[in-house]
Amino acid sequence: MAGSVLKIAGRRLSQHTGSGAPVLLRQMFEPKSCTYTYLLGDRESREAVLIDPVLETAQRDAQLVKELGLRLLYAVNTHCHADHITGSGLLRSLLPGCQSVISRLSGAQADWHIEDGDSIQFGRFALETRASPGHTPGCVTFVLNDHSMAFTGDALLIRGCGRTDFQQGCAETLYHSVHEKIFTLPGNCLIYPAHDYHGLTVSTVEEERTLNPRLTLSCEEFVKVMDKLNLPKPQQIDFAVPANMRCGIQTPPS
């Protein structure tokens, strides 16, 4: 199969094959949970992946895939979300041949369970999997194979980060994940998060390394800040998390 999960050990794939076209990227927004969904495709093979689809906008995503003449191989989740129900189960029904993907450490059901170091191939491109736990134990960051862009889920947000006070979160673990798995990428690597609540769409590794008010702190100071956030519980957590544990392979009831 052209879209297979491969192990990459110490080598970097090229984003381009010869003079081939660059990766196709579309960033989409779901306003209720302020979630970004990302569509990436190979303009030559027409193979594509979706990152962090939302149930309420899965029909929109499927329509865009069809309009662009793409073949969706994977609906991928960066982690088991607490603020929305994933659209991956519905997309499997809407676009036959699509498979759901999530980290094995998430404990959620899916067609494919990935681990740190795995690569999701679509045409000439690949998304490298970097385990980035802390927000949840199963969080991963997906890095395009030329290291030009990273899809950080809730681990790293623009000038912020995911909370660590539920779903077995750990502030110290998150701090080390970001510094060791994301901040080690090139400074001009684009950062695309799973959420933004201020109208921002993209950042860079260098910006976040130098300007992120939480992650420029020491680890000890970061843990203290995270412990004092005292945020309200996500409105959808009580039904979103149970649903997301199985919606990788099931279409949610209407």
From Swiss-Prot:
<dbReference type="InterPro" id="IPR051682">
    <property type="entry name" value="Mito_Persulfide_Diox"/>
</dbReference>
<feature type="modified residue" description="Phosphoserine">
    <location>
        <position position="14"/>
    </location>
</feature>
<comment type="function">
    <text>Sulfur dioxygenase that plays an essential role in hydrogen sulfide catabolism in the mitochondrial matrix. Hydrogen sulfide (H(2)S) is first oxidized by SQRDL, giving rise to cysteine persulfide residues. ETHE1 consumes molecular oxygen to catalyze the oxidation of the persulfide, once it has been transferred to a thiophilic acceptor, such as glutathione (R-SSH).</text>
</comment>
<feature type="binding site">
    <location>
        <position position="79"/>
    </location>
    <ligand>
        <name>Fe cation</name>
    </ligand>
</feature>
<feature type="modified residue" description="N6-acetyllysine">
    <location>
        <position position="66"/>
    </location>
</feature>
<dbReference type="Pfam" id="PF00753">
    <property type="entry name" value="Lactamase_B"/>
</dbReference>
<keyword id="KW-0223">Dioxygenase</keyword>
<feature type="binding site">
    <location>
        <position position="154"/>
    </location>
    <ligand>
        <name>Fe cation</name>
    </ligand>
</feature>
<keyword id="KW-0539">Nucleus</keyword>
<comment type="subunit">
    <text>Homodimer. Monomer. Interacts with TST. May interact with RELA.</text>
</comment>
<keyword id="KW-0496">Mitochondrion</keyword>
<dbReference type="GO" id="GO:0005506">
    <property type="term" value="F:iron ion binding"/>
</dbReference>
<feature type="modified residue" description="N6-succinyllysine; alternate">
    <location>
        <position position="32"/>
    </location>
</feature>
<keyword id="KW-0809">Transit peptide</keyword>
<dbReference type="InterPro" id="IPR036866">
    <property type="entry name" value="RibonucZ/Hydroxyglut_hydro"/>
</dbReference>
<dbReference type="GO" id="GO:0006749">
    <property type="term" value="P:glutathione metabolic process"/>
</dbReference>
<feature type="modified residue" description="N6-acetyllysine; alternate">
    <location>
        <position position="32"/>
    </location>
</feature>
<keyword id="KW-0597">Phosphoprotein</keyword>
<dbReference type="InterPro" id="IPR001279">
    <property type="entry name" value="Metallo-B-lactamas"/>
</dbReference>
<keyword id="KW-0560">Oxidoreductase</keyword>
<dbReference type="GO" id="GO:0070813">
    <property type="term" value="P:hydrogen sulfide metabolic process"/>
</dbReference>
<feature type="binding site">
    <location>
        <position position="135"/>
    </location>
    <ligand>
        <name>Fe cation</name>
    </ligand>
</feature>
<feature type="modified residue" description="Phosphoserine">
    <location>
        <position position="19"/>
    </location>
</feature>
<dbReference type="InterPro" id="IPR044528">
    <property type="entry name" value="POD-like_MBL-fold"/>
</dbReference>
<dbReference type="GO" id="GO:0005759">
    <property type="term" value="C:mitochondrial matrix"/>
</dbReference>
<protein>
    <recommendedName>
        <fullName>Persulfide dioxygenase ETHE1, mitochondrial</fullName>
        <ecNumber>1.13.11.18</ecNumber>
    </recommendedName>
</protein>
<dbReference type="GO" id="GO:0005739">
    <property type="term" value="C:mitochondrion"/>
</dbReference>
<feature type="transit peptide" description="Mitochondrion">
    <location>
        <begin position="1"/>
        <end position="7"/>
    </location>
</feature>
<keyword id="KW-0408">Iron</keyword>
<dbReference type="GO" id="GO:0005634">
    <property type="term" value="C:nucleus"/>
</dbReference>
<keyword id="KW-0007">Acetylation</keyword>
<keyword id="KW-0479">Metal-binding</keyword>
<dbReference type="GO" id="GO:0050313">
    <property type="term" value="F:sulfur dioxygenase activity"/>
</dbReference>
<keyword id="KW-0963">Cytoplasm</keyword>
<comment type="similarity">
    <text>Belongs to the metallo-beta-lactamase superfamily. Glyoxalase II family.</text>
</comment>
